[in-house]
Amino acid sequence: MTPLAYSKQGHLRFRRKSPSNISKSPGEHLTEEQLQALHADACYAECLLQRAALTFLQDENMVSFIKGGIKVRNSYLIYKELHTFIQSNSSLQGPNHIHLEGGVSFGIGAFNLTLSMFPPRLLKVLEFAGFSGDKEYGLSQLNDGATTNNLRSMLCALLLLCYYTFLTFILGTGEGDVADAEKLLKPFRLRYPQGAIFLFFAGRAEAIKGNIDEAVVLFEDGCKAQQQWKQFHHMCYWELMWCFTYKCVWRMAYFYADLLSNESRWSKAMYVYMKAAYLSMLAPGEARPFGEDEVDLFRQVSTFKQKIAGKSPPTEKFAIRKARRYKASCPVRLPVPVLEMMYMWNGFSMISKRPELTEGMLQTLVEAERILLESPANEYSMDDRCVIHLLKGLCLKNQGHIRAAEECFNKVYNSEKKIRFDHYLVPNALLELSVVYIDTGRKEEAIKLLVKAKTNYKEYSMESRTQFRIHAALSKLKADTSDQDEITPL
């Protein structure tokens, strides 16, 4: 934060005293001092964005959260004014103009692209506050910034890669934009063959394509490429953990969850939960690594609860709720906690192109279902059965068994009144059933289910993520449902 503060103060010295300083008649050139002030404005807006991001990540009180929001708005207004100017006849095409354009493309593109992902009702509120979100325009601005030789081309490229390989995948319907990501990556991979960040995104692209072994190699190479930035290693560990999850290699996945729990401060509760979850997937008599016990680990999860901007992250809340049953003296085990969390990160889409990986998951679910049916009924029985039905439906959909997948999703929906704890299951079952309808051309039926999932269910686990996916599915159908949109902030 301190270097950013110094940078911000430095740019303040060169900034314009008032907005009118850039108003010129057509053909009238700006002075060198005025041009310098415009570049300082772009740098200042960028600093505000970065400081806001750090505020959201580091500080844990509402006052700091509000301050971060003010920085974001001030940054946006500066970018908006600069964008208006460079589009005007007054804009001077000097030797450094391309760098100013790159900075403005980054800011305008980032705001438009990010805000376009919000559902219409929330976007209307943001537009009232002076923001706007246009996905296509945001993408075009970032592409312009990434493909021209300017100081912000790298930032534009990295933001696009995040969008193509993470945001569209995790908050969308699970496709990702791999072709666009690889096209963008190609020149950077040639220029920086050992660039850690580009190895990471290349690994992410391979994982989305279902090439899990290739992804593992790239993530491992990314770790080897640099040793200074440990947080980057943690990003790779997280991806490696999921890669081994897709392969059902529980011990290796546990190994990376253990590394994260020991080294990373991002979400200790999540890492401990995943460690316990992986151990629970091992056979009862199988030796546990480091002598750890999953029941003890599940009981520890809530002790690592944290708050960001006054609230716990949704993924932590979910993990704590799921682990709560282990507080009992004779706890009822979770049937497939790893696969349930994998669903929350859209992991079943990762294995959709790999029949053998989907089959491995399906067999794990079939065995868990057998154990559940043979066990005495308890207060969690119906919820656990519905978890398995939802996940089996995803596997069957991946295998092309559409009718069987629909039956699984409908079983969850029809059990709505019997579900006691996992209320997220029904809206997600409706979402997945609608995706099946979209894939099979039943557009009107899909829209009805999506609207029902969006409007009839509130205050369930991971609601924001589900609502974003619903919005993405509706956008895919180009359905105008702005009057019914509701969302809980992430």
Where are these regions (language model features)?
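Short coil/linker segments at helix-helix boundaries
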Residues: 1-187, 208, 220, 228, ...
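Boundary/linker segments of alpha-helical solenoid repeat arrays
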Residues: 4-12, 91, 151-156, 196-197, ...
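"A position-specific structural signal for the A-helix of alpha-solenoid helical repeats
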Residues: 36, 43, 47-50, 100, ...
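Alpha-helical adaptor scaffolds
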Residues: 161, 207, 237, 378-426
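A compositional/structural signature marking long, glycine- and acidic/polar-rich segments
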Residues: 181-286
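Active/binding-pocket-proximal capping segment
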Residues: 215, 221-224, 238-239, 259-263, ...
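Extended repeat-based solenoid scaffolds, especially LRR ectodomains
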Residues: 298-301, 308-383
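C-terminal interaction modules of eukaryotic adaptor/scaffold proteins
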Residues: 424-484
